[in-house]
């Protein structure tokens, strides 16, 4: 759950979960519905006010790319409104660059730290600036911290999914894609007409899931449509084929990738021991 609280007057902590899109990748950009759920992995930001610093200082060790990204969030927050000087410390358990919503979770945790709980407007401004072209599904799932059905430009609705829907599910890391998400989004948008059928199928998968359809069958159908979009790399395709041959089902979560890795693959109905050793596996049992 998303929460912010002030322990002492000068110390504020806010947490934001990652997200997994069960159905809807890319289709949500074109008005089809999607379903996303929060993950047990999260970003926590601690803010300690200190007037003597005169600025907001980041205390976090990470890759240069992510350090710069988080500093951009802080600088945007400072430019948007009155922010007290102090130190922000970050703790993160969300896998980075893997389609699990880390970039949005950083924004939400940090804006809540700097502006307080009721900062959706400011958080959206930062998200729009740093992640242009986003559909809004990541933001809706992470801000609400609950499973949601999302349709672009509409208020997200909470969706009642079976509590054990991800019981035994695995997240398998196929590696970082060669393409960044904005590049992939642009490429899919440019082919909208030729991709009408797979986009429609992805939208239908959402409705089937809402109607308590067979989750494994829905995942298989969704994966086939994602492959038709061209955002599942050969490496990820091979892995998903192996999983299906073992009786399981799997799909890429998030933007995927044309070449290289495709980020995280969500797998259901298969034991972790059946996954080839070269792939790091995270269990979603919580």
Task: Indicate residue ranges for each PLM-predicted region.
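C-terminal nucleotide
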Residues: 2-21, 28-29, 36-37, 44-82, ...
């Amino acid at each position: 759950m998303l929460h912010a609280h002030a322990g002492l007057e000068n110390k504020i902590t806010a947490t934001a979960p990652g997200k997994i899109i069960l159905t809807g990748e890319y289709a949500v950009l074109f008005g089809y519905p999607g379903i996303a759920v929060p993950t047990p992995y999260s970003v926590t930001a601690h803010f300690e006010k200190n007037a003597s610093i005169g600025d907001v200082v980041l205390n976090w060790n990470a890759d240069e790319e992510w350090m710069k990204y988080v500093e951009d969030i802080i600088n945007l927050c400072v430019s948007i409104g009155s922010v007290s000087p102090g130190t922000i410390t970050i703790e993160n358990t969300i896998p980075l660059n893997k389609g699990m919503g880390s970039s949005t979770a950083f924004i939400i945790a940090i804006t809540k730290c700097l502006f307080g709980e009721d900062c959706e407007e400011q958080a959206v401004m930062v998200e729009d600036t740093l992640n242009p072209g986003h559909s809004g599904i990541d933001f809706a799932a992470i801000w609400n911290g609950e499973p949601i059905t999302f349709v672009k430009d509409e208020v997200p609705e909470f969706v009642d999914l079976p509590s054990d829907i991800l019981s035994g599910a695995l997240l398998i890391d196929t590696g970082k894609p060669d393409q960044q998400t904005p590049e992939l989004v642009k490429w899919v948008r440019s082919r909208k007409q030729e991709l009408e059928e797979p986009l429609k199928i992805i939208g239908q998968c959402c409705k089937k899931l809402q109607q308590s359809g067979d989750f494994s069958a829905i995942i298989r159908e969704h994966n086939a449509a994602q492959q038709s979009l061209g955002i599942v790399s050969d490496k990820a395709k091979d892995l998903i084929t192996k999983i299906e041959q073992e009786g399981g089902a799997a799909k890429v979560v998030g933007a995927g990738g044309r070449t290289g890795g495709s980020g995280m693959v969500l797998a259901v109905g298969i034991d972790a021991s059946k996954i080839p050793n070269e792939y790091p596996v995270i269990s979603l049992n919580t």
